[in-house]
């Protein structure tokens, strides 16, 4: 069976937004080729990236490649719709770079397995490791938390700096027995980590149906589905019960729109962990958090990505 590969030359900042667009248009898989992962100096020995070749990456910017089971007649419509959606991202103030689009035909066996070479076990901290389901991994110690991911339908592998920042913040700030809201859950990796770190239960929410299905599959894969309620929902709309922790790894443009709702659903003393924030938007997010009554307690960085931890006093 032949598939169509759509490649978009974009920026690191727009990677997740562009990936989401491609899934909405019917992509069965996405590969992100970012040269930064070759040269990144991580702030700890963790988060290692393995077995990557410079020949697989662009000289500048990022390639986001999607694979769709469409023929040439349907592909024209998909590309036109993609152009319209990319234009909307620009209207939202997101820098999408060149946003050039290239199309190629590929055989199913070329994409179904080749992308897996990019995804190996990643040590997020001395307690937590993310591994793909097809990789063998021996825990380094009995208390190590292993999160298994199958990113076949997902919006990420869990190794993006923003995800790692959120995981480390959860490990530091979430207490055993806490209840958690995971807004824009994607693969549900943060929800899974929260349960394995001792959360009582998690409500994982995403507006995208594909993300909801992916999240449900990953919670079952990790044996935590009985403690995680995955729901299709727009941010915190309609959510009333207060919890100890809210986590959101989404775009800064989205975070600033619902900080009032975060304050509303947090218990006094509760924690909001937000990421998906490029450094240039740090001040905007902090201003929105403070305006909503939240107190900034920590800012964490990996390269140009930021996670902000705030509390409701």
Curated annotation (Swiss-Prot):
GO terms for biological process: methylation. The keyword RNA-binding does not apply. One of its GO terms (molecular function) is protein-lysine N-methyltransferase activity. Keywords: Cytoplasm, Methyltransferase, S-adenosyl-L-methionine, Transferase. InterPro entries: Ribosomal_L11_MeTrfase_PrmA, Ribosomal_PrmA_MeTrfase, SAM-dependent_MTases_sf. GO terms for cellular component: cytoplasm. Gene3D superfamilies: Vaccinia Virus protein VP39 (3.40.50.150). It is found in: Cytoplasm. Methylates ribosomal protein L11. This is Ribosomal protein L11 methyltransferase. It comes from Brevibacillus brevis (strain 47 / JCM 6285 / NBRC 100599). The lineage of its organism: Bacteria, Bacillati, Bacillota, Bacilli, Bacillales. The gene is prmA.
